[in-house]
């Protein structure tokens, strides 16, 4: 009975399979009829398994067409190998990436560092479930040469339909190779109701914009006294971190420990963007390229501003010439920027993009330059006289400078490398004709300049038509102008014929001759250029602001150094607790808006208070955002240099409270109202003044032979708080215990207080050190940040711990040292306590404590506080 029930259940399951969407009645009819006619018979498990496998293989080809759309939907059946391959093949290669094969020593962090990205970005690109990678694994990494274009990204369209991907097309080929007539596509209504295949890729720029939760900016970290280093500023919602580039010269010299910093976002009190740095200390650390970004042509900037087109354009003739590349490039940049920013000729750049006008202008310019060279070779004396006449004509006609400067900017944007010789020919042409017409020198030059200005106007109007030199001749009013017009047309035809016959050797001679002429002209034009020095400085300032802005971060606690141990970083933070916590970065101008937008997303909502909704605690509040209209009216100073500033909520309330308190005090003074604070301050101030000298006079067990009373008072003000109130006990003195370092160590036994060492050398100078622990023999350095060194030579100075290292005290049997770093000690004594040495060191940032680096010890006193 059990066997009959089993066969009945199998028939039932087969009848259900007939209605399955992938069932093929033609393929299954031949098999189902014999099974129905046979009587039920007992079957072994092996036979049942073979029949189930054969049934699955019969149904598989008919269902391949449906797998294309349904392979991501769980049907409750066992997934086949083809289905897994289809899922794997649907992973598209993201745009802007290349394939990278993991090597044996690679990790996800090392791969991210190699391709200038982050491990999180690699995880998102490759849809990884962990950060573990294996050798031979293929990963998609960002292509450094990829340039994203908004026009070519189809994902930017929000209404674009889902189109079949290349992986789906390959899936069709691999899964249905033997089907001659595939199943017809269902109607559109059916397709819309079916869930499309999942495409595992994130190449959309919109999606990247939403998933990118950090800023990665290449900038420069400006330190105080330690130079400026290049690196990467990483700004995340939780931290701000700067990693220096290992290839930077200062990093290679001083190490990464000096420049790698990080702080939590909660510690940031203020972030402000400045056009320039006004602090003199920070300004001294600026490199030349940041302080004067236009300094590449500083020696030529004055000349470039005042020189006319015939002077500047020949120097900008050949940009590929290495021997004279600095001056021409800087001159060309200054002239082109002046022409297009001040004369507003920028539309010409877009109008002259067609190749035909540019080629014809280049050929005309080159042909004219060839004739210029031939004329210079035949009549060198005439060329010299013409070069001498250039400044005369410039000074005689003040309007010529502006016209020619605008023309040079126009030629810079349109004619490329051949523009210089054409302008030289245009200058020399009228001068040769002026020798024939002796009495009308200035008139001809003014006519020629007006014609050049008219030609520039015609260029700005016509954008697509072919422009030739003969189609825009000089238009002159008198008969002489008509003759010049006909002569210019004739010269153009002759010049075109001459151009075909000249070789590269003549072009080289032409460049040499032009450089000689430009050198002569630059000497004569230096006087005219000095008058425009003020305009040149303004151009430098404008260009500097155009390239870099300065980000100032003010934090509540010092930033922690990232390339040192946790203990060292904590101690360095403690050492810098009393300093001004301000950090400056030179940021590219195009990233300043990104920083502002990044901080803005934590600012409170504008209408949160009106609507009564307060969703989250705000992070930053905008206190200053300068508009263009305000920038012109802003007064000089720090407020004018600051473009925007965002502050934390705590800092905002602190400023408001300080402002209200100051306004309240001002109002009380104006109304002559005496507050309780004023009364208390007047009563307490005299008492403090009387008690202050007494409070800093400690009791000494023995009179000091090295320190005066006023020196003791000065030292007491800088002692650690745990020593205040304790008497000074003399535990060691050379006059009492002798000059031996071993004896000094024996007298320190059993002490548990800071000790003060005072030294007097043979020159009569007094200096010393305060040790946080008694002196002892040690294997390495010991002590805490309470240790400092001091000197009274020539005036009293105290050098406390800088936080750079933890080399405080080192005791050996034959020496005793304070401070270290770079192989130098702040103070070093030998085993006989007779010879000593002092040098500047990083631990305390001190200078030489004595008059001379090497000194002889006359007397020593060591005081304990107990």
Swiss-Prot record:
* UniProt keyword annotations, A-Z: Mitochondrion, Nucleus, Phosphoprotein
Extract the SUPFAM superfamilies matched here: LysM domain
Localization per Swiss-Prot or TrEMBL: Mitochondrion; Nucleus, Nucleolus
UniProt keyword annotation of Transcription regulation present: no
Residues modified as Phosphoserine: 90, 201-202, 204, 294, 334, 336, 346, 488
Q: Which SMART domains match?
A: LysM (SM00257), TLDc (SM00584)
Q: What superkingdom heads the lineage?
A: Eukaryota
A cellular component term, taken from the record's GO annotations: mitochondrion
Which Pfam family, any one, appears in the UniProt record?
LysM
Kindly list the biological process annotations in GO that this record carries: adult walking behavior; cellular response to hydroperoxide; negative regulation of cellular response to oxidative stress; negative regulation of neuron apoptotic process; neuron apoptotic process
LysM domain boundaries:
98-141
Where in this protein does the record put region Mediates oxidative antimutator activity? 543-570
Q: Where is the composition biased (Low complexity)?
A: 150-168
In-chain residues carrying the UniProt-annotated modification Phosphothreonine: 118, 341
Q: Name one GO molecular function term.
A: oxidoreductase activity
Chief subcellular location equals mitochondrion
| Bias (Polar residues) | 364-399, 448-465, 502-519
- GRAM domain sequence ranges: 213-268
The residues covered by the TLDc domain are 705-866
> Residues annotated as region Disordered?
1-92, 150-202, 293-540, 682-703
Q: Where is the composition biased (Basic and acidic residues)?
A: 63-88, 170-184, 347-363, 433-447, 483-497
Which tissues express it? Answer: Highly expressed in brain and testis.
General function of this protein: May be involved in protection from oxidative damage.
Name the family the entry cites. Answer: Belongs to the OXR1 family.
The protein depicted here goes by the name Oxidation resistance protein 1
Native organism is: Mus musculus (Mouse)
Q: Which gene encodes it?
A: Oxr1
């Amino acid at each position: 009975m059990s066997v009959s029930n089993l066969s009945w259940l199998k028939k039932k399951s087969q009848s259900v399979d007939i209605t399955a969407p992938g069932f093929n009645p033609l393929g299954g009819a031949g098999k189902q009829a014999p099974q129905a006619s046979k009587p039920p018979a007992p079957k072994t498990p092996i036979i049942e398994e073979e029949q189930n496998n054969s049934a699955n293989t019969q149904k598989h080809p008919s269902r391949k067409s449906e797998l294309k759309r349904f392979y991501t939907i769980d049907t409750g059946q066992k997934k086949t190998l083809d289905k897994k391959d289809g899922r794997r093949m649907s992973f598209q290669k993201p745009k802007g990436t290349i394939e990278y094969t993991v090597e044996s020593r690679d990790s996800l962090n090392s791969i991210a560092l190699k391709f200038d990205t982050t491990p999180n970005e690699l995880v998102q690109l490759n849809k990884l479930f962990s950060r573990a990678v294996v050798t031979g694994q293929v990963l998609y990494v960002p292509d450094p040469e990829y340039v994203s274009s908004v026009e070519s990204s189809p994902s930017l369209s929000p209404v674009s339909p889902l189109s079949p991907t290349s992986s789906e097309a390959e899936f069709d080929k691999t899964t249905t190779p033997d089907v001659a007539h595939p199943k017809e596509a269902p109607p559109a209504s059916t397709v819309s109701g079916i869930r499309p295949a999942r495409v595992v890729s994130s190449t959309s720029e919109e999606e990247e914009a939403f998933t990118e939760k950090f800023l990665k900016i290449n900038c420069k970290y400006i330190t105080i006294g330690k130079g400026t280093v290049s690196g990467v500023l990483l700004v995340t919602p939780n931290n701000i971190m700067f990693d220096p580039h290992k290839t930077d010269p200062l990093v290679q010299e001083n190490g990464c420990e000096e420049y790698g910093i990080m702080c939590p976002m909660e510690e940031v009190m203020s972030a402000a963007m400045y056009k320039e740095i006004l602090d003199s200390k920070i300004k001294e650390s600026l490199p030349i390229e940041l302080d004067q970004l236009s300094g590449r042509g500083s020696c030529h900037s004055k000349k470039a501003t005042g020189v006319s087109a015939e002077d500047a354009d020949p120097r900008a003739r050949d940009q590929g010439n290495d021997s004279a590349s600095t001056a021409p490039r800087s001159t060309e940049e200054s002239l082109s920027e002046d022409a297009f920013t001040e004369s507003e000729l920028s539309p010409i750049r877009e109008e002259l993009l067609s190749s035909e006008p540019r080629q014809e202008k280049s050929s005309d310019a080159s042909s004219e330059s060839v004739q210029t060279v031939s004329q210079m070779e035949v009549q060198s004396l005439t060329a010299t006289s013409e070069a001498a006449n250039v400044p005369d004509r410039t000074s005689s006609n003040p309007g010529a400078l502006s016209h020619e400067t605008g023309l040079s900017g126009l030629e810079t944007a349109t004619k490329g490398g051949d523009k210089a010789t054409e302008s030289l020919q245009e200058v020399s042409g009228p001068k040769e004709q002026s020798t024939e017409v002796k009495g009308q020198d200035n008139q001809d030059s003014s006519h020629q300049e007006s014609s050049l200005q008219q030609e520039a106007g015609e260029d700005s109007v016509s954008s697509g038509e072919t422009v030739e030199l003969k189609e825009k001749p000089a238009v002159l009013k008198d008969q002489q102008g008509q003759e010049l017009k006909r002569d210019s047309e004739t010269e153009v035809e002759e010049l075109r014929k001459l151009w075909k016959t000249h070789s590269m050797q003549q072009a080289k001679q032409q460049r040499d001759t032009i450089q000689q002429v430009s050198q002569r002209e630059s000497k004569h034009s230096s006087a005219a250029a000095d008058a425009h020095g003020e305009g040149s400085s303004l151009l430098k300032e404008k260009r500097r602001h155009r390239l870099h802005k300065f980000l100032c971060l003010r934090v509540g606690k010092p930033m922690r150094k990232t390339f040192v141990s946790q203990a060292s970083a904590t101690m360095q933070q403690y050492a810098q607790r009393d300093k001004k916590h301000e950090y400056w970065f030179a940021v590219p101008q195009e990233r300043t808006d990104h920083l502002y937008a990044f901080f803005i997303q934590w600012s409170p909502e504008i209408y949160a208070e009106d609507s009564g909704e307060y969703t989250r605690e705000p992070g930053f509040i905008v206190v200053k955002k300068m508009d263009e209209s305000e920038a012109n009216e802003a007064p000089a100073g720090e407020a004018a240099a600051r473009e925007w500033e965002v502050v934390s909520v705590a800092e905002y309330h602190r400023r408001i409270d300080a402002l209200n308190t100051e306004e309240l005090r001002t109002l009380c003074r104006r109304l002559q109202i005496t507050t309780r604070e004023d009364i208390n301050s007047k009563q307490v101030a005299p008492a403090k003044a009387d008690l202050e000298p007494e409070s800093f006079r400690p009791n000494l067990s023995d009179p000091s032979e090295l320190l005066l009373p006023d020196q003791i008072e000065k030292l007491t003000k800088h002692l650690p708080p745990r020593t205040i109130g304790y008497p000074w006990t003399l535990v060691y003195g050379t006059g009492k215990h002798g000059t031996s370092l071993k004896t000094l160590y024996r007298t320190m036994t059993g002490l548990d207080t800071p000790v003060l060492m005072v030294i007097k050398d043979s020159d009569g100078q007094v200096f010393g050190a305060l040790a946080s622990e008694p002196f002892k023999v040690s294997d390495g350095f010991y002590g805490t940040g309470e240790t400092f060194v001091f000197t009274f030579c020539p005036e009293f100075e105290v050098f406390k711990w800088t936080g750079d290292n933890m080399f405080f005290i080192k005791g050996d049997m034959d020496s005793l040292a304070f401070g270290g770093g770079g192989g130098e000690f702040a103070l070093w004594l030998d085993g006989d306590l007779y010879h000593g040495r002092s040098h500047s060191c990083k631990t305390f940032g001190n200078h030489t404590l004595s008059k001379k680096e090497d000194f002889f010890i006359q007397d020593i006193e060591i005081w304990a506080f107990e």
